[in-house]
């Protein structure tokens, strides 16, 4: 998945957060829907201006971000 064709950052839209090109739907919002239990079908029905490929691009963007350097500090696991 080539997310670069679908995910953009524009300082004039949502303060520069990564969004689906041509929308105000952020990668953060898409990830939030899925972490809340939404299905792909629910997202597509609720937001017909995005596509399945847009959703996959959001996940690809997040995966690449985490792969490169997106680790949040966490408490150590108890032994």
Q: Residue ranges of each PLM-predicted region?
A:
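Intrinsic-disorder/low-complexity regions
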Residues: 1, 9, 48, 52-53, ...
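Basic, low-complexity segments
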Residues: 1-17
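Intrinsically disordered, low-complexity and often Lys/Arg-enriched segments
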Residues: 1-2, 73-79
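Exposed, low-complexity/repetitive linear segments and helix-based recognition motifs
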Residues: 7, 25, 65-66
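Amphipathic, hydrophobic secondary-structure cores in small proteins
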Residues: 15, 19-20, 24-61
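C-terminal structural segments of small proteins and small subunits
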Residues: 52-76
């Amino acid at each position: 998945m080539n997310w670069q064709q679908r995910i953009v950052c524009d300082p004039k839209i949502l303060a520069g957060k990564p969004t689906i090109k041509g929308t105000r739907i952020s990668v953060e919002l898409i990830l939030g829907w899925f972490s809340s239990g939404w299905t792909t079908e629910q997202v597509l029905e609720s937001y017909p201006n995005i596509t399945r490929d847009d959703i996959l691009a959001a996940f690809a963007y997040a995966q690449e971000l985490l792969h490169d350097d997106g680790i949040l500090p966490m408490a150590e696991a108890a032994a």
